[in-house]
Amino acid sequence: MDVSIDFAGLKLKNPILTASGTFGFGLEFQRYGDLESLGGIVVKGLSLKPREGNPMPRIAETPCGMLNAIGIQNPGVEEFINKKLPKLPWKTLPVLANLYATDAEEFGELAGVLAGEEGVAALEVNVSCPNVKEGGIAFGQDPKQITKVAEAVKKNAGNKPIIIKLSPNVTDITVCAKAAEDGGADALSLINTLSGMAVDIERRTPRLANVIGGLSGPAVKPVALRCVYQTVNAVKIPVMGLGGITTAEDAAEFLLVGAKAVQIGTGNFLSPDTAFRIAEELPKVLERVKAESLDEFIGSLKLPK
């Protein structure tokens, strides 16, 4: 079955991408599979300047998932452009950059740096970062700030599609989705991690140095599915689903509720070949459930009467 798809102007050979922060810059996973067998990769979050990230420990295993508080450790956008991007097969593999910033103006500046890079297919904007100018509340929890960030990035991004990555740590994710759409976003990706924590009762200490981290993995999949389903029915722009996908069947569930593409995140930590395996198995799963085509299957959920 042909599983190629157009996502917000991106020509994807299949709807399977990797999630930012779980696949490095792609180069680290080349030994486990053919990068060009994927629909695309989203590289780890990039900031204008290098970031060391949070102190250790940054990761804690939880039942059916994991908590992380990496703190967007990265070498900075210039290092990515000069040393990482040239090594990627970007002519045949869509490479999406994930943007991290502390205010809307900085997001716009970062988009401007990447706008002229032929090897970057699209910009994914992480609005789960704290807005330093507004008291530290995450952009993604304030619809007005989401619109402002989307506008700032869109203004400077040239012809690159803008994907706003939404946080589930809100009362109504559809309000945030509409805010991103109003700001000119070409697409959405969701969900980012759920806010959580873990403690050690023997030491009486948090298991993360940052105390609070982001929960991901199979535990969050029902929440992610609900968020994608609600969002698809609230906006006109396409949605990329992520959250707890570890099998081709999981990926198909997100497509069924209306996502046009999906991202594999924590599954890459469980087994480094996860994304490659899902990309290979998805056509077989769609054929097994008697889908006429990928387009026919997307959003074909039958609701109770």
UniProtKB/Swiss-Prot annotation:
The entry's active site is C129 (nucleophile)
Gene3D superfamilies, per the entry? Aldolase class I
| List of residues binding substrate | K44, N68, A69, I70, G71, I72, N126, N192, T193
Cofactor dependence: FMN
Q: Which residues bind FMN?
A: S20, K44, G45, N98, N126, K165, I191, G217, G243, G244, G265, T266
Q: Give the organism, scientific name.
A: Maridesulfovibrio salexigens (strain ATCC 14822 / DSM 2638 / NCIMB 8403 / VKM B-1763)
The record's similarity note reads: Belongs to the dihydroorotate dehydrogenase family. Type 1 subfamily.
Q: What is this protein called?
A: Dihydroorotate dehydrogenase B (NAD(+)), catalytic subunit
Query: What is the annotated role of this protein in its UniProt record?
Result: Catalyzes the conversion of dihydroorotate to orotate with NAD(+) as electron acceptor.
Q: List where the protein spans the membrane.
A: none
Q: Where in the cell is it found?
A: Cytoplasm
What does the cofactor field's note say?
A: Binds 1 FMN per subunit.
Which catalytic reaction applies to this protein?
A: (S)-dihydroorotate + NAD(+) = orotate + NADH + H(+)
Q: In which pathway does it act?
A: Pyrimidine metabolism; UMP biosynthesis via de novo pathway; orotate from (S)-dihydroorotate (NAD(+) route): step 1/1
Question: Could you confirm whether the keyword Oxidoreductase appears in this record?
Answer: yes
Q: How does it assemble?
A: Heterotetramer of 2 PyrK and 2 PyrD type B subunits.
Q: Which GO terms describe its cellular component?
A: cytoplasm
Alphabetized NCBIfam families for the sequence: PRK07259.1, pyrD_sub1_fam
A biological process term (GO) from this entry: 'de novo' pyrimidine nucleobase biosynthetic process
**EC number, as in UniProt:** 1.3.1.14
Give UniProt keywords alphabetically.
Cytoplasm, Flavoprotein, FMN, NAD, Oxidoreductase, Pyrimidine biosynthesis
